[in-house]
Amino acid sequence: MRLRKKWWARPEMEASPLCIVNPKDYKGKWREEFKNDNEIYLELGCGRGDFVTNIANKHPEKNYVAIDLKDEVIAIALRKITESEVQNVRIAPLQIAFINEVFDKDEIARIYINFCNPWPKDRHKKRRLTHTKFLTKYKEFLKPNSQIWFKTDDDGLFVESLDYFKECGFQIKFMTYDLHKSGFDKNIVTEYESKFLKLGINIKFLIAELK
């Protein structure tokens, strides 16, 4: 997704109490930020914020942290979150390679990874958010029995991710190659998901649990 530079993005981010512009400063302090002891769920690559806004509205008893890289993307998502008036979301700019510098041990109870870049070339596969390189980082801050919910349209990424999860000690609790015909009733449809469905592309989905 290529977006033009938006001059207003960083000032809006810095002015909003919902945006954490220096997330590394909050390691071990996220419960203080939310001012409660509710479980914290993490979305990696939140895009325009549709998913996190909808799920936070549906589950006010949980806290959500949404991460993306570019200010232009964060700012659009921030406006959506702000307009929805949800208070249980914080959004932050971050290169996900540094995600283990943002959360402390047992600080996160669930991770959502929705339609991440599949990086199909062999030399790029270590950039996948489901690669063992990243899963090892997530394990540093996930609570025992935490889950990763992973959705993709890409067959190759999905199949290889199954191996990544198993290699890193996760147990596959649920898996389907066609989410919308699986009977799974806890799905929140994302913007990309809607587009893929219109094209007749099956959505692959799994829940991996950390043991």
UniProtKB/Swiss-Prot annotation:
Residues holding S-adenosyl-L-methionine: E43, D68, N117
Record field: catalytic activity: guanosine(46) in tRNA + S-adenosyl-L-methionine = N(7)-methylguanosine(46) in tRNA + S-adenosyl-L-homocysteine
SUPFAM superfamilies, per database record: S-adenosyl-L-methionine-dependent methyltransferases (SSF53335)
Gene3D superfamilies on file: Vaccinia Virus protein VP39
GO cellular component, one term: tRNA methyltransferase complex
Catalytic activity, EC: 2.1.1.33
Enzyme class (EC, first level): transferase
Classification via PROSITE patterns: SAM_MT_TRMB
Pfam family, one: Methyltransf_4
Disulfide bond sites: none
GO molecular function: tRNA (guanine(46)-N7)-methyltransferase activity
Family statement drawn from the similarity comment of this UniProt entry: Belongs to the class I-like SAM-binding methyltransferase superfamily. TrmB family.
Cited HAMAP family: tRNA_methyltr_TrmB
Stated name of the protein: tRNA (guanine-N(7)-)-methyltransferase
Protein species of origin: Clostridium acetobutylicum (strain ATCC 824 / DSM 792 / JCM 1419 / IAM 19013 / LMG 5710 / NBRC 13948 / NRRL B-527 / VKM B-1787 / 2291 / W)
Chain's gene name: trmB
